[in-house]
Amino acid sequence: MTSKTIKRCAFMVAALLFTMSSFAQLRLPAGYYWKQLPNGLQVVVIENSKVPLATVQIAVKNGSFTEDSVYNGLSHMFEHMFFKANKDYPTQAQFLKRTQELGAIWNGTTGYERVNYFFTFDTDSLNAGLKFLNAAIRFPIYRIEDMEKERKVVDGEFQRAESDPGFQLNFEVEKRVWGDLFTRKNPIGIHDIINTATPEKMMVIKNKYYFPNNSLLIICGDVHHESAFTLAENIFGDWASSGSDPILKYPIPPFKPLVKNDIFIKESTIAKTPYMMFEWQGPSYATDSASTIAADVFSTIVTLNSSKLQQALVDKGLATNVSVGYLTCKYTGPIQIFIVPNPNKLKECYAELLNQISMWNNPDYYTDDQLKDAKGILLRNDIMAKEKPSSLPSQISFMWCSTSLNYYTDNTDDYQKVTRADIKKYLDTYLINKPFVGGLIISPDLNKTVNAASFFAAK
């Protein structure tokens, strides 16, 4: 045996041991079962017999976080083309006929860090449904005529979104928050890229990311995990691994931190009601998972009707709605405040928001009871979210793509463990005196009256 062969064997053993140790402490809720196939495909089976249905979903670590300006929006286009044609059903008419035969409800979504596809049908159709999913994910057919039709559909989604002033404001804020890497936080894409998408570009995406070792298969519903694992292995077991982690092979560049506040005003004739939006670069699961938990708890506190933020803005008539949220991401999640201000009190609303933010880190900004109430809301929200079996696969696949299965399992318990010190660390690290982007969208007529530039500016 040569030294090169010995080194290769040693590397393979080390990799195997690392994989085994990575999953040795895997935690899942009761009724959830996990298995990794030899090709790297992870399979989660969720036994839930509330109704005689099964939902199958496959999630891929793909989405806008993998896209540069040449491919922006094409993960979304790829998702649409998934439902067109494949080796077993070579036309969309045949594909759709098969969904009707299965009695399937189906859809897909594309986000920052996940693309997922799912079908729900009678439990008796599980074997046939998994074969149908297998054909679509592994053996797609991309025809120019199909793509020409779907370009219009995908771009139509974009154009409809642009008719919403809230989308217009969000789009401009995001461009400024993420700078040169905006495309990696822009799942909807770029018009020109969508309208010139080709089969060749679809195959580039497929050959980069659509491998079993970059995917999670979830089988949920009135099923038994042992037989479901057997079906998964029989149907997906010969799907060839890429041989390496695609996310490591095609590294994701880090986002550049904001260096100063960026405040802008956007006039739009469709903005019948003005909106304000503010965004910070928040925590990343990969580097600060604890703060992703604290972020959700704090956001819930300040959206309580009893919170100082709501009382200062909504109860005092400065705004009709104030929402605060953080989106968990592996690669830098956004922290957002969205406000529907009183058109007659825009200056006062903006000034009071800044005043409230400056006080967020004061020990008396929220009470122990409000902290307890926020944790209770998060617990109840989790219970309600898990009432519908067909929604469970999307919940766990989102976490698998952006965090981990353990994070999903522990999430609700971890909310209950959040302390004031955890929240203070989150606020100090990401919000208090940290640069942000702020935007106001307003109609030209209203702006003539209020002269927003005289007060809506960096301070």
Please give the residue ranges for each predicted region.
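Bacterial N-terminal signal peptides that target proteins for export
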Residues: 1-13
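Non-catalytic, conformational "gating/processing" segments within enzyme and secreted inhibitor domains
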Residues: 151, 199-235, 435
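M16 family metallopeptidases and their MPP-like homologs
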Residues: 46, 51-69, 73-77, 91-136, ...
